[in-house]
Design a protein with these regions (language model features):
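Solvent-exposed soluble domains appended to multi-pass membrane proteins
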Residues: 1-328
Length: 328
C-alpha cells in the first residue's frame, strides 16, 4: 500500500556510486558525460533536487549521510555545492554495528531516525543517505544465512545475498518506525549499481559469457530496483523500467511538492524516453536504441537534453537559473 516500485537503469556497473548519486541529485544523465562528475565537473553551486526541496514551505535542514570516508569522490566538497546543510560521515557514528568492515544498514538507518527525532519541531527534514554495508568485495570472512547450491561461485554470491537480506531487515525496521509517525514521511530507496560478482555467476543467469552480451543484456545488467513508500496516500504503481536521472523528479511528483521547469521537462521526456543511461535508451514503445543515433525524433530529443544539461553544468554565465529552481 502507498508504494511506487520498479526498476531503473544505472549508468554504472560494479562501482562508481557517485555517478548514480549525480544523476539522481541533478537530473542529469551520464549519457553525455565521460568520467566522474563529482571529481571533474562540480566546482560551484548548482541547483539540485535538494535546493528545490529546501525551497518548499516548511522545509528546514537537508542532511547527507554516508558512513564512510568523507573525502571519497570529493563528497565533502560536492555536497555543500548541491545545497546540503550538513554531511555526516563515518566520523559521526559512535560504536555502530559493523557487518564485515562496514557500518551496517541497521546503524545507518538508526542515524536517520535520530536525525528525525532531533529535527526542529516545526520543520520538515530532508535526508540523502548512501549506505556502505553491501560494498564489495564479497570475499570477507563472513558467514551469512543465505545458501546457494547451484553456483560454482557460491561463496561470493551467498555473501552478497546474505547482505541483501540484512538490508531488507533494516529497511523493514525503518519503514515500521515511520509508519507510526504522526507526521507525513516519504522514502525513496534505490540501488546504485549491480554488484561486481564473478563472470560465471552472470553466465549462469544469462546463459552466456558476459563478453558475448548484447546491448539488451548489458541494459539488464545495469538495472537496479527502486521503491517510493509513504505513510500517506500516494497510490500504487509498478514501473517496468525507468532510469536514475528521472527518479528525483518522480519523487517530487509523488510527494506533491512544487517542481521546477526542469523537473517538468524531465517528466515529459520520461513519457517519450522512459529509460536512458550510458548504455543505451528505451523509447515509450519498448524499443532499445543506441545513444549515438543521429537522426529521427529521439535523436532530436536527446540533443535537446544534452544542450539543457550543458547549460546547467557548464554555461555559468548564461545558465537559465529560473529554469532549474522552484520559483516562489
Amino acid at each position: 500500500k502507498n508504494v511506487v516500485k520498479g526498476y531503473a537503469e544505472s549508468s554504472v556497473y560494479g562501482g562508481y556510486t557517485a555517478n548514480s548519486e549525480f544523476e539522481f541529485l541533478t537530473g542529469c544523465t551520464k549519457t553525455f558525460l565521460p568520467g566522474n562528475p563529482y571529481l571533474q565537473y562540480i566546482d560551484d553551486y548548482l541547483p539540485s533536487v535538494i535546493s528545490n526541496i529546501k525551497s518548499q514551505k516548511g522545509y528546514g535542514e537537508a542532511v547527507a549521510v554516508h558512513p564512510y570516508n568523507p573525502s571519497g569522490y570529493n563528497r565533502n566538497r560536492v555536497y555543500p555545492l548541491l545545497h546540503f546543510d550538513r554531511f555526516l560521515s563515518i566520523d559521526d557514528f559512535k560504536n555502530p554495528l559493523l557487518i564485515r568492515d562496514y557500518i551496517s544498514d541497521k546503524s545507518d538507518y538508526e542515524k536517520i531516525i535520530d536525525l528525525y527525532k532531533n529535527k526542529k519541531k516545526d520543520k520538515s527534514l530532508c535526508v540523502f543517505n548512501v549506505t556502505m554495508q553491501n560494498h564489495n568485495p564479497y570475499n570477507f570472512d563472513y558467514v551469512g544465512d543465505v545458501k546457494v547450491t547451484d553456483f560454482s561461485v557460491s561463496s561470493q554470491v551467498e555473501q552478497y545475498l546474505s547482505l541483501m537480506r540484512k538490508s531488507d531487515d533494516a529497511l523493514k525496521e525503518l519503514i515500521t518506525y515511520f509508519k507510526k509517525s504522526d507526521e507525513p514521511a516519504i522514502i525513496l530507496v534505490f540501488g546504485d549499481h549491480q554488484p561486481h560478482l564473478p563472470d560465471s555467476f552472470y553466465e549462469k543467469l544469462f546463459g552466456k559469457n558476459p563478453v558475448q552480451f548484447s546491448r539488451e543484456d548489458s541494459m539488464k545488467e545495469h538495472l537496479i530496483p527502486f521503491m517510493i513508500w509513504a505513510n500517506y496516500d500516494i497510490g500504487e504503481e509498478n514501473i517496468e523500467r525507468t532510469s536514475i536521472n528521472y527518479l528525483s523528479s518522480l519523487l517530487l511528483e509523488k510527494a506533491g511538492l512544487k517542481m521546477s521547469d526542469y523537473n517538468r521537462y524531465l517528466l515529459e521526456l520520461y513519457k517519450e524516453i522512459p529509460s536512458l543511461s550510458a548504455t543505451g535508451f528505451y523509447d515509450k514503445n519498448g524499443v532499445l536504441h543506441d545513444n549515438k543515433e543521429s537522426t529521427g525524433k529521439y535523436a532530436e530529443m536527446l540533443k535537446e537534453y544534452e544542450m539543457i544539461q550543458y547549460n546547467y553544468l557548464f554555461d555559468k554565465d548564461n545558465r537559465l537559473d529560473k529554469h532549474y529552481n522552484v520559483m516562489k
